[in-house]
């Protein structure tokens, strides 16, 4: 009886006592308060449908590819991004990645699910969603994979199977953020292996931030070589320029 009362009290407290907005710090019942939601999310930027690079124009206009994707299409087929990697949204990615603010993974995942409902209309249905894998050493050090923290709620909302072990990181590479852009592709070129059958599948790949695109490029190439029919990237934030 006492245990049940404790559970009820905990649920009541969670519902009744406000948290703080992850951006402004004001009291809020949601991870992002309504004010910050309106100010920083729901952007209308037109993006390249292949790599999510921002383009001139507004969302809803004709779907043009950026010059790089038009000239040399990457191995992935589409990329969805919530917003640019810029202040103050960049702090959310950093808090998730380095400060174990795992509620932000759910926030990113659920927002990506809403975006996907419209953006992927008419595309082949997703068969499985998987995170960009971390090297074992880094996973042990951090204790979690921030991409998986996004992938699980995304898959749950889209009612798609999630698989944390679909791909494996077989090379413990240097952090991409420490390398010049031209060195990033070589750094991750042979970093991944496919651990489950993917032949004929539409695979959704999840990461927190897309910068040069080298990591997602390498993983998509590995998936395609293993027979994946289509690869769609889901990223919380996208740097404005490669």
List each language-model region with its residue ranges.
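Glycine-rich phosphate/pyrophosphate-handling loop used in enzymes and phosphotransfer proteins
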Residues: 1-207, 211-242
């Amino acid at each position: 009886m006492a245990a049940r009362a404790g559970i009820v009290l905990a649920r009541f407290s969670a519902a009744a006592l406000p948290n703080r907005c992850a951006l402004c710090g004001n009291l809020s019942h949601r991870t992002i308060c309504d004010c910050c939601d309106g100010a920083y999310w729901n952007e209308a930027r037109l993006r390249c449908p292949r790599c999510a690079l921002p383009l001139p124009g507004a969302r809803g206009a004709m779907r043009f590819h950026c010059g790089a994707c038009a000239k040399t299409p990457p191995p992935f087929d589409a990329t969805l991004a919530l917003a640019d990697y810029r202040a103050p949204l960049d702090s959310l990615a950093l808090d998730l990645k380095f400060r174990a603010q795992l509620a932000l993974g759910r926030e990113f995942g659920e927002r990506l699910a809403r975006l996907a409902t419209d953006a992927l209309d008419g595309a082949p249905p997703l068969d499985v969603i998987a995170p960009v894998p971390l090297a074992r050493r880094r996973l042990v050090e951090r204790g979690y994979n921030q991409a998986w923290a996004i992938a699980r709620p995304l898959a749950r909302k889209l009612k798609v199977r999630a698989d944390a072990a679909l791909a494996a990181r077989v090379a413990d590479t240097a952090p991409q953020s420490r390398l010049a852009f031209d060195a990033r592709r070589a750094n991750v070129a042979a970093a991944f292996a496919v651990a489950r059958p993917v032949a004929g599948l539409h695979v959704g790949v999840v990461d927190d931030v897309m910068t040069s695109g080298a990591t997602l490029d390498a993983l998509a190439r590995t998936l395609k070589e293993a027979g994946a029919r289509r690869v769609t990237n889901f990223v919380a934030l996208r740097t404005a320029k490669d």
